[in-house]
UniProtKB/Swiss-Prot annotation:
Entry's family note: Belongs to the zona pellucida-binding protein Sp38 family.
Sugar-bearing residue positions: 85, 158
Role noted for this protein: Plays a role in sperm morphogenesis and in sperm-oocyte interaction during fertilization.
Top-rank taxon, per record: Eukaryota
Protein name, entry field: Zona pellucida-binding protein 1
Recorded topology in the membrane: Peripheral membrane protein
Signal peptide per UniProt: none
GO annotation, cellular component aspect: acrosomal membrane; acrosomal vesicle; extracellular region; zona pellucida receptor complex
Organism: Gallus gallus (Chicken)
Record InterPro entries: Sp38-bd, ZPBP1/2_C, ZPBP1/2_N
Upper classification of the organism: Eukaryota, Metazoa, Chordata, Craniata, Vertebrata
GO biological process: acrosome assembly; binding of sperm to zona pellucida
Membrane recorded as keyword: yes
Length: 320
């Protein structure tokens, strides 16, 4: 019976429409310019492994002034910054660009500016402070749970079926550059209403979509990860609905292992990498970003928020 069902699932899968969508690498513009303030540290958000915007060593007022003999000196979390470092660019006018940004580059950056507005005047001094944070996009996925009427819980048929179901679901969404992973599978004895005990398999899967950096182009909206993930959800839901329809039309006896109608659930889940979290109050200019956890906070797992930890003194802490 179980083998008959697997054959049916494979036939259904082969009939499923193939959906292909590949995305080209987006060109990143670094033309954004960030101006400092003497009143408060300006927050700057830099995507991991990308270059920062142009970070200026001037205020809005000085930006439109002529500065005589300006001297710029940048300091970062590790001390003095110099263009001798391959990941640091400092222009003659004091503009800072950080390339291939890493987690450990997050922190407080200061620029000391010495200048004159009139040649005969003494030097003026100004210190501008920035808080620069690494961030990444949320890693989101669907969590899929489903139940099957099963063979006796000690039967190897259940294990074989679980592997085959994973393979089938993975193949179903492969053309979307998505993948399915088994989180856990459990067999339980279930007491039926006004009936005896029956064995049921409880499956939990995750459905994720990969970043696609290919040369083939397609419409951006159709290649976005959320769009592909929703499409994968539609294909999986259609697959289980189709299985119920075919079983209801069949005159054959029920197989030993079969999907229990109505048990499929797919829940959208957001997550950040360990050491990162979403906080729209603390980071209103990057409200949906997974921003590196500041000192006095941490995120130990793939959660969604940084948690308070008064003993943590570093950026990106994963332990307290």
């Amino acid at each position: 019976g179980g083998l008959l069902l697997l054959g049916l699932l494979i036939v259904l899968l082969q009939a499923a429409p193939a959906v292909q969508c590949l995305r080209s690498a987006e060109s990143r513009s670094n033309s954004l310019k960030i101006v400092g303030s003497i009143l408060f540290p300006v927050k700057v958000y830099v995507k991991l492994d990308h270059s920062s915007p142009h970070i200026l060593c001037v205020t809005n007022r000085l930006r439109n002034s002529e500065l005589i003999d300006p001297v710029f000196r940048w300091n970062g979390p590790s001390g003095y910054l110099s263009s001798a470092n391959s990941s640091v660019q400092i222009s003659p006018t004091g503009t800072l660009i950080l390339g291939h940004f890493r987690s450990d580059l997050s922190g407080v950056y200061t620029c000391s500016l010495v200048y004159k507005l009139i040649a005969a005047q003494p030097d003026k001094r100004l210190t501008i402070k920035y808080h620069i944070y690494a961030y990444s996009d949320p890693q989101y996925y669907y969590e899929l749970t489903v139940q099957y009427h099963a063979a006796p819980c000690n039967s190897f048929h259940n294990t074989s079926f679980g592997r085959a179901l994973l393979q089938i679901l993975s193949k179903l969404v492969a053309d979307l550059s998505c993948e399915v992973s088994l989180i856990k599978s459990e067999c339980h004895h279930v007491k039926m209403q006004r009936g005896g005990l029956q064995s049921e398999m409880f499956f939990k899967f995750s459905v994720t979509c990969l970043d696609t950096e290919n040369n083939k182009l397609c419409r951006q909206s159709a290649c976005d990860k959320p769009h592909r993930l929703h499409k994968a959800k539609d294909l999986i839901e259609r697959f289980f609905k189709r299985e119920v329809e075919i079983r209801k039309k069949s005159t054959e006896p029920l197989p030993e292992i079969y999907y229990i109608e109505g048990t499929l659930q797919m829940v959208w889940v957001d997550r950040c990498y360990p050491g990162y979290g979403i906080n729209a109050v603390r980071h209103p200019d990057c409200p949906e970003c997974c921003v590196i956890c500041s000192p006095r906070s941490y995120n130990p797992s793939n959660g969604i928020h940084c948690l308070q930890c008064d003993t943590s003194l570093i950026y990106g802490a994963t332990t307290c």
